[in-house]
Amino acid sequence: MSGSNREAALAGQPKDERKKSGGGVINRLKARRVQGKESGTSDQSSITRFREEELLGLNELRPEHVLGLSRVTDNYLCKPEDNIFGIDFTRFKIRDLETGTVLFEISKPCSEQEEEEESTHLDASAGRFVRYQFTPAFLRLRKVGATVEFTVGDKPVKSFRMIERHYFRDRILKSFDFDFGFCIPNSRNTCEHMYEFPQLSEELIRLMTENPYETRSDSFYFVDNKLIMHNKADYAYNGGQ
């Protein structure tokens, strides 16, 4: 999940108390597939290839379109107003599943602070991009959990799905595919994505550490197989050096 840079150090209270809790239990979701050269599952010969320029000319994008991209996108493939379901990500936490150590946590600002910041906000991409910095040790983790909390507007959300693709210098490292399932209207939902990272070569770890923010990702969100949200992130692995 991605969010704006201004969210990274803030932990606000829930902004809409009428949101239903969604059951109070964290759903743990495992990716349906993992792709990437380092994982040994790089054979994607059955996937139709697409260029970003081709997709920008389409009125509706589906999962097979973004799965056919071979490099990170330069543009956002949908507009903020395409999120007609009012889906809003409010909290995000990354932890090492083997030790339970929290590696990163952000929360959306409370309503008052958000309104104040929006009054001076000029960047159309704000809210759709986040920059991460980790230590080199992060690249050696094998299992990571990403807990996300999000709210839903007045419409039911059918078949909510996320496809997240990670690249280093436009070389795809891994592709994750998660199903959130059905979300009831006016609900607050929490789930933990369970990432199983491929083992990276020592040379690739060195390059990714020495070249901060050249590792990037696209996160595509679909409802009923139609793209409604597109977030971006970049990563540095030189923290603590």
UniProtKB/Swiss-Prot annotation:
It comes from the Eukaryota. Tetradecanoate binds at residue 132. GO terms for cellular component: ciliary transition zone; cilium. GO terms for molecular function: lipid binding. One of its GO terms (biological process) is nervous system development. It comes from Xenopus laevis. Its main location: other. InterPro entries: Ig_E-set, PDE6D_unc-119_myristoyl-bd, PDED_dom, PDED_dom_sf. Pfam families: GMP_PDE_delta (PF05351). Keywords: Cell projection, Cilium, Cilium biogenesis/degradation, Lipid-binding, Protein transport, Transport. Belongs to the PDE6D/unc-119 family. Adopts an immunoglobulin-like beta-sandwich fold forming a hydrophobic cavity that capture N-terminally myristoylated target peptides. Phe residues within the hydrophobic beta sandwich are required for myristate binding. It is found in: Cell projection, Cilium. Myristoyl-binding protein that acts as a cargo adapter: specifically binds the myristoyl moiety of a subset of N-terminally myristoylated proteins and is required for their localization. Plays a key role in localization of proteins to the primary cilium membrane. This is Protein unc-119 homolog B-B. Residues 1-46 are annotated as: Disordered.
